[in-house]
């Protein structure tokens, strides 16, 4: 009983410590999310600029390589930030967190809520599983960025091919009309030359 009373006396201080640690974690998580969103926005802006421009093949290939390198750097930065966010709790705080988990599990059992059970199960996941989840999210973001860039490059290539074909057709029509006009002029000149000797013989 005395141990329980000692725990109850220390809980306000420990809760303040745990709350401070949780607030720091939450602030770090928000900062990393904000930085990740800024990186995603920058990459999407670059992909939009790639969509509007139609560079030659070599320049387009260089830009694709640069954007892939930037996407990989962004992925690495996100993974590094997730590693830095992962911090260890002091032993007293861990004990208090475990006690709170036990209390919440008991409360969930008494209420029988599915959401509470799911939340407590997520809290029980080890840190390496949470880190794996963050890595998967970073990989997925990188995949989406690469997919967007690939679609932009394909759109630009399609537009270039269409324009070349339309230009060739237009030039082909013009060439055909010019040849027809010249041929008609040649025919008229040859006819007029034939008529001139005949007309001179009549005079």
UniProtKB/Swiss-Prot annotation:
Coiled-coil positions: 13-82
Keywords of the record: Coiled coil
Q: Which residues form the IQ domain?
A: 129-158
Keyword Coiled coil on entry: yes
Q: Where is this region: Disordered?
A: 1-111
Q: Does the keyword Coiled coil apply?
A: yes
Q: Name one Pfam family in it.
A: IQ
Which spans does this entry mark as compositional bias, Acidic residues? 29-38, 64-73
Compositionally biased region (Basic and acidic residues): 1-12, 39-51, 74-86, 96-111
Stated name of the protein: IQ domain-containing protein F3
Q: Which gene encodes it?
A: Iqcf3
């Amino acid at each position: 009983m005395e141990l329980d009373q000692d725990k109850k006396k220390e809980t306000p201080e420990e809760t303040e410590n745990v709350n401070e640690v949780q607030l720091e974690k939450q602030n770090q998580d928000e900062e990393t999310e904000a930085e990740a969103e800024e990186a995603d926005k920058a990459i999407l802006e670059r992909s939009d600029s790639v969509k509007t421009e139609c560079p030659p093949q070599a320049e387009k290939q260089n830009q694709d390589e640069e954007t892939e390198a930037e996407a990989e750097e962004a992925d690495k930065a996100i993974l590094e930030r997730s590693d830095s966010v992962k911090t260890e709790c002091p032993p007293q705080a861990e004990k208090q967190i475990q006690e709170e988990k036990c209390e919440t599990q008991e409360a969930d059992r008494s209420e029988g809520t599915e959401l509470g059970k799911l939340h407590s199960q997520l809290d029980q996941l080890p840190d390496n599983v949470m880190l794996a989840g963050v890595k998967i999210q970073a990989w997925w973001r990188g995949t989406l960025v690469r997919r967007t860039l690939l679609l932009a490059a394909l759109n630009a290539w399609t537009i270039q091919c269409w324009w070349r074909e339309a230009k060739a057709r237009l030039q082909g029509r013009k060439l055909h009309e010019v040849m027809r006009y010249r041929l008609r002029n040649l025919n008229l000149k040859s006819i007029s030359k034939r008529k001139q000797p005949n007309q001179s013989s009549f005079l």
